[in-house]
């Protein structure tokens, strides 16, 4: 099966289960979890069912294409269902059947593997899904994001499309065996990008510049999340300017949080990516590592807290009644 067909089939399957098929986020992330449609939307009471492909960058995982199934940039297919359906495991097994796997004929195992992302203050209980001895999916019930409780708990399913294609076709290498479609190979689409970024990540990236960038992105994220914005009911917009209007201001549940959460979160993601580049360059000591992780987590948490403000009225009304 080609990568393209794999993605099309997953899109069709999860759309039929009620998921909106979204697009990849355009900021460097280390996993589909960091896409704001997961990282922010798993918080709060509102139902949220989405699926999307996300290119994921993990600079330290590069192997100059010498490893047939490991790279610094690869794809994840992410599914979020909130609240988690009671039959989510059956839905997942159905997705494997839709891809052409015979789950009854293959050795499919759910291996307990509780998940944690320290830099995002995120975690949950879950499993790795293994088929015939190879990991194909991470399955998580989110309990925390940004150090805040996820209520209701939502289900996250993260597929590795490249590996699924190889297993389905009984092949072994991204770089020699995998096709993107009928006319373009995975190697043609990804090889030069992968090789050149490996050289940059491990040999060329300026650590002095990266340390400065981390500080700059961190400070800008702090400044942006603390910037006062107001809702202008006349114009129907958020603004930093004065608002003079006789129209009532809608509740926060309609206008969203009165803060620039998404721009501040983008900057937090940039901090995370810069940290990962520094880690690949070997510029982060063991003692520094915890400090940098805490700094990234602080930025993510600040964004999550502001995002949650839109639900305060709802919570207070519920308590009053």
What residue ranges belong to the model's regions?
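Terminal leader/tail segments of proteins
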Residues: 315-316, 320-321
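Structured aminoacyl-transfer and RNA-binding surfaces used for tRNA recognition/handling
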Residues: 1-315
């Amino acid at each position: 099966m080609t990568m393209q067909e794999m993605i099309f089939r997953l899109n069709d399957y999860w759309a039929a289960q009620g998921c909106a098929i979204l697009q990849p986020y355009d900021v460097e992330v280390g996993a589909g979890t960091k896409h704001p449609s997961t990282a922010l939307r798993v918080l709060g009471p509102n139902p949220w069912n989405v699926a999307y492909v996300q290119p994921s960058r993990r600079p330290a995982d590069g192997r100059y294409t010498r490893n047939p199934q490991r790279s610094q940039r690869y794809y994840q297919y992410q599914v979020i269902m909130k609240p988690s359906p009671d039959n989510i495991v059956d839905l997942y097994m159905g997705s494997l059947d839709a891809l052409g796997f015979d789950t009854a004929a293959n050795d499919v195992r759910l291996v307990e593997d509780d998940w944690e992302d320290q830099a995002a203050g995120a975690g949950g209980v879950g499993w790795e899904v293994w088929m015939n001895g190879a990991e194909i999916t991470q399955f998580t019930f989110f309990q925390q994001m940004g150090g805040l409780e996820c209520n209701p708990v939502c289900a996250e399913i993260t597929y590795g499309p490249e590996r699924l294609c190889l297993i389905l076709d009984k092949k072994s290498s991204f770089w020699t065996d995998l096709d993107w479609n009928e006319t373009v190979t995975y190697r043609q689409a990804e090889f030069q990008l992968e090789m050149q970024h490996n050289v940059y990540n491990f040999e060329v990236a300026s650590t002095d510049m990266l340390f400065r960038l981390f500080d700059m992105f961190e400070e800008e994220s702090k400044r942006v999340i603390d910037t006062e914005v107001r809702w202008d009911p006349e114009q129907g917009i958020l603004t930093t300017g004065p608002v003079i209007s006789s129209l009532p201001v809608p509740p926060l549940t309609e206008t969203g949080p009165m803060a620039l959460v998404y721009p501040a979160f983008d900057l937090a993601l940039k901090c995370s990516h810069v940290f990962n580049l520094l880690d690949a360059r070997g510029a982060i000591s063991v003692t520094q590592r915890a400090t940098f992780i805490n700094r990234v987590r602080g930025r993510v948490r600040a964004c999550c807290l502001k995002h949650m403000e839109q639900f305060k009225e709802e919570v207070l009304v519920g308590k009053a009644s």
